[in-house]
Amino acid sequence: MLADGYFTLSDGTRVGVAGDYVKANGVFQSFTSLCFRVPHELRFPDVSVLAELYSSGGSVVFVGPPSSGKTTALKSFASYLSERVDVVVADERHELSANNTADCDVIRGADKRYAFEVAVRSLSPQWVICDEVTNADLPYVCDCVNSGVNVACSVHGTSKEDIEKRFGDKFSCFTKAVILDKRHSVQVVDLQKSSTMTKSKEI
């Protein structure tokens, strides 16, 4: 983890690291600052949004800049889903499973390729939840969806147009996008119909 710029404490606190990185060895030679992201027992405020995402069917992507509430939304959605269906949480960075995922099957510390493969082949979920998907991860996400398993994940971004520009057709496997921002507004966008529902709620 440290070579990736962070490490995770036993309670789920993620500590980001800044300093002098030595590329050849893949380690930090010295540290200049640390950023602590302490997990809290928070819930996504509008259960009706979670209910809509579940009842409408299809995979969901939560989109927002850092600290916009993406991980909180995913945790709440995982908890909501786990009361209704079988859920696997692919927790690569040890953050998603810090709180309120007791009824989920959790794969911690594995990269998304391995976690998605194990989930589909061995755990029989209806949903897989993961955080911070990159362009390189999307083929594994789409393979999972094409296998008949819905996915809820997050990406860094600011709008539907932003993620479409950056990721193109790779996002075709998602049905809805939930756009979050630091002003605590929530937009649910139907990616198949381009319709938008806006809700202003504090996260």
Segments predicted by a language model, with ranges:
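Hydrophobic anchor at the beta1->P-loop junction of P-loop NTPases
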Residues: F62
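Conserved P-loop NTPase
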Residues: S10, D20-Q29, L180-I203
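P-loop NTPase switch/communication element
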Residues: L81-A119
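Conserved P-loop NTPase nucleotide-binding/switch module
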Residues: P125, C130-L191
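P-loop NTP-binding catalytic core
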Residues: M1-G57
